[in-house]
């Protein structure tokens, strides 16, 4: 694939760095490379880490209440209160009309489930809680999967385990000067080993200064394809698999 317009530009008046050399090398070979504004500064990364830490705390607060009998609205209430207590803004609230602060997806719902008083968690349900928030205009995005009551069917237990393994394997593939396709390839290979399908309509994405940024991180694909990964890029890996 050849891109007529160059995406990478060296800083005027500055020496060419190893990063410049690597990116220009791959761009000259016809690979898709990031633009310079996709590379976060150390200060920006520090702010994103703070947002990520607050987001982790929010999911920890959710973990403390997950049990049979609560509603997904109860989860939303906890997330809203946690954001208020920690000077954070729930990014999902009113995003493209989404009415709640968090996504709660039960069993066959892949993602973006809307919390409701009527949606009561039952023993053996699997529920994904997907939270994005901002702190001082920096964004953190993460989700966590729960088995309600701690026990479910062997089929659901394996699905949850393999999904987590896909995340870990995808993260291991995210190395400097590799490609987004390397991540997707690793995830797809592991999921298909257990005869699961990878959801293709949704993907990970860049994050940090906004809720959704470049690049799109597909959870399937081929090695050596997609955008070049370089130090300073920040993105989510959120594999979704199904039986």
Give each language-model segment a name.
Residues 1-243:
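Active-site neighborhoods and metal-handling regions in enzymes and metal-associated proteins
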